[in-house]
Design a protein with these regions (language model features):
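Glycine-centered loop/turn positions within well-structured domains
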Residues: 102, 155, 167, 200, ...
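Conserved SAM/AdoMet-binding glycine-rich loop
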Residues: 72-73, 81, 186-319, 330
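Terminal RNA-binding accessory module
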Residues: 352-450
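Short flexible coil/turn linkers enriched for glycine and charged/polar residues
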Residues: 140-143, 153-155, 262, 272, ...
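Proteins enriched for Cys/Gly/acidic motifs involved in redox and nucleic-acid/cofactor modification
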Residues: 1-202, 218-221, 251, 266, ...
Length: 450
């Protein structure tokens, strides 16, 4: 039996699709490319924007056309938020919510036996237990592995549907995280990326200040995971997929700087550069608090890599607010700025707010901010010119005779090579590279040692 996957959305979805694939392989399935003929197709959906919903529906229809007799399984956030809408799409056989992914092998077997369409979706208030999908240890042609450490979010930002799609905060057991990391490192992975719906919330519900208001001196929260993984022997590095300034502050990120294996890069989601808009978004920090975190990191390491998310066209966003977002991106010299046009989502407070921004204004602001973000990244790359960086080599661009990889501070580096066989042997290796000049979406470099 053959099974194919199409995954939309975030790194958590990618991780979960790999875990689901591993579970089906244990049942004797062969995983094939989504464009190939398969007996089962799994679409792992996203619902962060209306565009994501539309893409999910398109892929459902597309996969059924490849094999009209296949079993089509739709899971993920869109399936959780709009199960009836997903069920109504022609060709869908099984709809499974976000906390049902570990049961998909059973659901498919049941469908193949009885041929009855299935709907397995709990209400978000019932999503209160971590759904352990098992260890992901596929090491074929890979250098970077993702480990999911937590599920859910309780922040309820006014624009965001994800708390309804993912449920309450649930943290994965530390022993399971360490066991997965050890297997991945033993299997040859050189970079472990810690991911989750809101990684900063890992075990934070258990933390209480003492009577003097002091927080624990020993590692807590996501730092606890970093400390445990740092003790694993081997030549590898750890990367945090993101930290929310809505959860952590400058004092907390300062604690993370002592871990040598932790990459000097952080995705720090701003969402806006305007304190007024941040308040309307129900983000519990202002621009000044965000900049305090940035300053703390850059004072410790002027070349610390930062990336971010910005929403343009949030209800009530004025031109001055938008200019605040532009200036934030300029000042922070982000290595990458992800830009989203505000999209009205079900169940959210922002959907009923006054002052919705016209589509053409959102488009104009998005285009402008893309230009600002590109210049911000180029400025960050230029600051790194002439530096020596340790690069993990990942991919050969044979038609260009380039080998590419990433620095710890998340700069994509292009290094020319002459001997294809030797270059192939350097994949998944750390090498020292001199960063020479801004190039494409990163920098061109010169290898100084193998």
């Amino acid at each position: 039996m053959k099974i194919a996957f199409h995954t939309l959305g975030c790194k958590v979805n990618q991780y979960e699709s790999e875990a689901i694939a591993a579970a089906f392989e244990q049942q004797g399935y062969t995983v094939v490319d989504e464009r190939e003929f398969a007996d089962v197709y799994v679409i792992n959906t996203c619902t962060v924007t209306a565009v994501a919903d539309k893409k999910s529906r398109q892929y459902i229809r597309r996969m059924k056309k490849v094999n009209p007799d296949s079993v089509v399984v739709v899971t993920g956030c869109y399936a959780q938020i709009s199960p009836e809408e997903v069920s109504a799409v022609d060709g869908v056989d099984i709809v499974a919510g976000t906390n049902e992914k570990s049961h998909l092998t059973d659901y498919v077997a049941e469908f193949q036996e009885h041929g009855m369409r299935q709907l397995h979706v709990k209400g978000y208030e019932e999503l209160d237990a971590y759904d352990e999908t098992g260890l992901v240890v596929n090491t074929e042609n890979r250098t970077r592995a993702y480990i999911k450490i937590q599920e859910g979010c309780n922040r309820f930002c006014s624009y965001c549907v994800i708390p309804y799609a993912r449920g309450k905060v649930r943290s994965r057991g530390l022993s399971e995280i360490v066991a997965e990391a050890e297997k991945l490192i033993t299997g040859g992975y050189r970079e472990i990326v810690l991911t989750g719906i809101n990684t900063a919330l890992y075990e934070m519900e258990q933390i209480r200040p003492d009577e003097a208001g002091r927080l624990p001196e020993e590692p807590y929260g996501v730092e606890k995971v970093i400390a445990a993984l740092s003790d694993i022997p081997g030549d590898f590095r750890i990367r945090l997929s993101s930290l929310e300034p809505a959860v952590v502050d400058a004092d907390y990120v300062k604690r993370l700087l002592k871990y040598d294996k932790l990459c000097h890069h952080l995705h720090l989601s701003a969402q806006s550069g305007s304190s007024q808009v941040l308040a309307a978004m129900n983000r519990p920090y202002d621009r000044e608090a965000y900049m305090d975190i940035v300053s703390t990191l850059r004072e410790a390491d002027p070349y610390y890599g930062l990336s971010t998310d910005i929403i343009v066209g949030f209800p009530g966003e004025k031109e001055a607010d938008f200019e605040d977002s532009c200036s934030l991106v300029e000042e922070c010299t982000f290595c990458k700025t992800h830009i989203f046009k505000y999209s009205k989502r079900p169940f959210t407070k922002a959907a009923s707010m006054k002052g919705h921004v016209a589509p053409q204004v959102k488009n104009r602001r998005s285009d402008r901010l893309h230009d600002v973000g590109k210049k911000s990244a180029e400025a960050f790359f230029a600051e790194n010119k002439g530096r020596m960086e340790r690069v993990l080599l990942e991919e050969l661009l044979e038609d260009q005779q380039m080998i590419t990889g990433y620095t710890g501070n998340y700069i994509k580096v292009y290094v020319p090579y002459e001997d294809p066989e030797a270059a192939q042997g350097m994949l998944n290796q750390f090498v020292s590279v001199e960063l020479l000049e801004v190039c494409r979406d990163g920098m061109r470099g010169r290898m100084v040692e193998k």
